[in-house]
């Protein structure tokens, strides 16, 4: 009997259609439930320590600018308005030089974010004065701690500018200057009275006798900054002594007091740099004086120039010092800035940073 070969069974078209229909239905169901088979959207990067300081200083600057503008729009006296205008203009410059508000280009996850606490409380002169004091203290602490030396120099300059604005606003309004609010950093920063005390040693290469170890090699940047500041103070001390000799009795006493203050500060920074009594000491026996010192205008301008030079060197010492050892240099910048203004210098938005000394045009 002939055998019958059975051919292999093949899927029927109807069965294939049913399977395909089921797959499509499953995909559509998943899509309807919000399931997406794709990569997640890019996340906002977490700011590092440097960006946190930069962003915080920018936010405070913008809040101060907005607060000063709001207060100035009310009924205030002309002297108060002049200071408020400087608060707004200086703070706008601060935010600009710091790079402004960070924008990652990603969609804002919280478009209705509330304003910062500082911005919400600046409604009058008293609140603005408190905000200036708090923000100056916070910037001082940030400048001391931030790892980036150039950002430290810039933030220190901003802190000193805010401190000077607070002094001016308190003076024209007759309001007492408040202490920083509880919880605001900066309470440990040296004040003007301690700016000439012994600064913190910048490096471990200094020996107990004030020199540097023979195998220390090239001076560390912190040592160079401290030595440059010692030189600026020494030149100021010498010039004030010359001015005292050329002054009347009424002015001679104040000139000699300034000379003594700068000489003490010079000695302190020289010891910090480890150059006292060594060939590396940059201080000199005498310094060049500007031509035409017999002209009263030239003689009156010299103290301003001397203090501004100390301020510039102080800002340089901030940048050269390691993080956590900058408070004395910041205090020196604050003192020199206040002294320059006392001798007739115009307030500037960036003390100690002559490269940013563009005059503000009303």
Walk through the language-model features, giving the residues of each.
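C-terminal motif of bacterial Sec signal peptides marking the signal peptidase cleavage site
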Residues: 28-32
């Amino acid at each position: 009997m002939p055998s019958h070969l059975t051919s292999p069974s093949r899927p029927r078209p109807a069965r294939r259609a049913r399977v395909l229909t089921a797959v499509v239905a499953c995909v559509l169901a998943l899509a309807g439930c919000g399931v997406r088979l794709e990569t997640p959207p890019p996340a906002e990067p977490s700011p590092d320590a440097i960006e946190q300081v930069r962003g915080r200083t920018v936010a405070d600057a913008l809040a101060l600018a907005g607060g000063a503008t709001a207060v100035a729009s009310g009924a205030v006296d002309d002297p108060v308005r002049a200071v408020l205008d400087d608060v707004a203009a200086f703070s706008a410059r601060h935010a600009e030089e710091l790079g402004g508000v960070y924008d990652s280009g990603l969609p804002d996850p919280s478009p209705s974010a509330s304003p910062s606490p500082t911005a919400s409380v600046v409604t009058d002169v008293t609140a603005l004065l408190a905000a200036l004091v708090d923000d100056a203290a916070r910037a001082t602490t940030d400048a001391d701690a931030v790892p980036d030396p150039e950002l430290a120099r810039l933030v220190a300059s901003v802190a000193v500018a805010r401190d000077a604005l607070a002094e001016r606003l308190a003076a024209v309004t007759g309001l007492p200057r408040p202490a920083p609010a509880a919880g605001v950093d900066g309470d440990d920063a040296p004040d003007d009275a301690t700016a000439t005390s012994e600064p913190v040693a910048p490096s471990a290469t200094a020996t107990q006798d004030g020199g540097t170890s023979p195998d220390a090699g090239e001076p560390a940047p912190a040592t160079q900054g401290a030595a440059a500041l010692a030189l600026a103070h020494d030149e100021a001390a010498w010039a004030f002594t010359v001015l005292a000799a050329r002054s009347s009795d009424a002015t001679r006493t104040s000139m000699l007091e300034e000379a003594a203050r700068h000489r003490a500060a010079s000695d302190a920074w020289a010891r910090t740099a480890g150059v006292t009594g060594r060939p590396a000491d940059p201080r000199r026996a005498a310094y060049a004086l500007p031509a035409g010192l017999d002209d009263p205008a030239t003689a009156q301008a010299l103290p301003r120039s001397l203090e501004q030079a100390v301020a510039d060197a102080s800002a340089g010492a901030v940048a050269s010092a390691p993080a956590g050892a900058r408070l004395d240099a910041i205090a020196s910048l604050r003192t020199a800035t206040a002294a320059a203004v006392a001798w007739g210098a115009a307030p500037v938005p960036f003390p100690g940073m002559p490269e940013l000394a563009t005059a503000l045009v009303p």
